[in-house]
UniProtKB/Swiss-Prot annotation:
It comes from Histophilus somni (strain 2336). Dual-specificity methyltransferase that catalyzes the formation of 5-methyluridine at position 54 (m5U54) in all tRNAs, and that of position 341 (m5U341) in tmRNA (transfer-mRNA). The lineage of its organism: Bacteria, Pseudomonadati, Pseudomonadota, Gammaproteobacteria, Pasteurellales. This is tRNA/tmRNA (uracil-C(5))-methyltransferase. The active site is at residues 322, 356. One of its GO terms (cellular component) is cytosol. Belongs to the class I-like SAM-binding methyltransferase superfamily. RNA M5U methyltransferase family. TrmA subfamily.
């Protein structure tokens, strides 16, 4: 892997700050709160293709521009734990032919709490012999001091040697939050910047009256940290593994005012507007909630127009965006009814064009 341009980090971040400031200028945004990343070892997950060459094999990546493959032995943007595991894993895999045969990818998911999942992906069916060798591999890694989960994946097959999750512990505002992270589900990749995002969101919403609604809550990353600022929190999520992780996280963090329902933002919009009833909402009276704050963290495509209209009904809007261009499209509508009170840049992905941002909007008085 090429050396990281660490000495350029501040200049690259300043460039992003200028770009986002310019994008938000038409909406009368206040100056940005800027949250920097660690300059190396900041990424908690990584995926590598495996290249086989005669008796050898190694991690590779592809150059996005030239599509050329290049060998990776160390990966300075990934956590120290992932780098340690990369060095330890390959020599051990080489001891077991059954583990290397038709292996085409390795995924790593690590935590600040020093746990790691290694997923081995194959172009073949995994059998009992594979399971025995993988169990031996896991024991060898535990002997080296790793707190590791091993998962084997193949077409329509997933074998967990113990479990397919790790429990992360995030320090946020003098509190420790437990988050179950499930393999192959979305988690924030930059843990220290995620902590800064949570702190910023808590600061925005402190002294809130009433209840919070969150759309697209994932494993409860934001709603769990924000629950302290509200009477009640109602959150929606569509992916089953994320919903069950969120339910675990609610219990683990002893949160008693947060309810998660498994439905899409679009369906929830229909339910809120009384367009149709949903079985999934049985036992939940939407009238019991006085949600005057809404939190959205949509996919790269931003909010669809129906959800923008729904969001505009709320007094306060907290919007976390992974795509400033779709954020600005949404702001063209949202700023007709709301003003930007605070805006932030979170450098989740250093040394890339990617910009994670947040805006805190308050309804304009008529």
């Amino acid at each position: 892997m090429q050396r990281l341009p660490i000495e350029q980090y501040s200049a690259l971040l300043a460039e992003k700050q200028q770009k986002l400031t310019a994008l938000l200028a038409p909406f009368n945004s206040p100056p940005l709160d800027v949250f920097a990343s660690e300059t190396s070892h900041f990424r908690m997950r990584a995926e590598f293709r495996i290249w086989h060459e005669q008796d050898d094999f190694y991690h590779i990546m592809f150059d996005q521009k030239t599509k050329q493959r290049f060998r990776i032995d160390q990966f300075p943007i990934a956590s120290q734990l992932i780098n340690q595991m990369m060095l330890a894993l390959l020599p051990l895999l080489k001891q077991h032919n059954i583990l290397t045969h038709r292996l085409f990818q390795i995924d790593y998911l690590s935590t600040l709490s020093n746990k790691i999942i290694v997923s081995l992906l194959y172009h073949k069916t995994l059998n009992e012999e594979w399971l025995q060798a993988a169990t031996q591999l896991k024991q060898q890694l535990i002997k080296q001091g790793f707190d590791v989960q091993i998962i084997g994946r193949a077409n329509k097959q997933k074998i967990c040697l113990q479990q397919d999750f790790v429990d992360e512990i995030l320090p946020v505002k003098n509190q420790q939050y437990i988050y179950r992270q499930v393999e192959n589900s979305f988690t924030q990749p930059n843990a220290t910047v995620n902590c800064k995002m949570l702190e910023w969101a808590i600061n925005c919403t402190k002294n809130s009256q009433g209840d919070l609604l969150e759309l697209y809550c994932g494993n409860g990353n934001f709603s769990i940290a924000l629950a302290q600022n509200f009477r009640k929190v109602l959150a929606t999520e569509i992916a089953k593994p994320s919903v069950s992780a969120a339910q675990f996280n609610i219990a683990a963090n002893k949160i008693d005012n947060l309810h998660i329902i498994r439905m899409s933002a679009e369906d929830f919009t229909q339910a809120m507007n009384g367009v149709r009833a949903f079985n999934r909402l049985k036992g939940i009276n939407l009238q019991d909630y006085q949600c005057n704050t809404i939190f959205v963290d949509p996919p790269r495509s931003g909010l669809d127009m129906a959800t923008v209209k729904l969001v505009q009904n709320y007094e306060r809007i907290l919007y976390i965006s992974c795509n400033p261009y779709t954020l600005c499209e949404n702001l063209q509508e949202l700023t007709k009814t709301h003003r930007i009170e605070k805006a932030a840049l979170f450098d989740q992905f250093p040394y890339t064009e990617h910009m994670e941002s947040g805006v805190w909007l308050i309804k304009k008085s008529n």
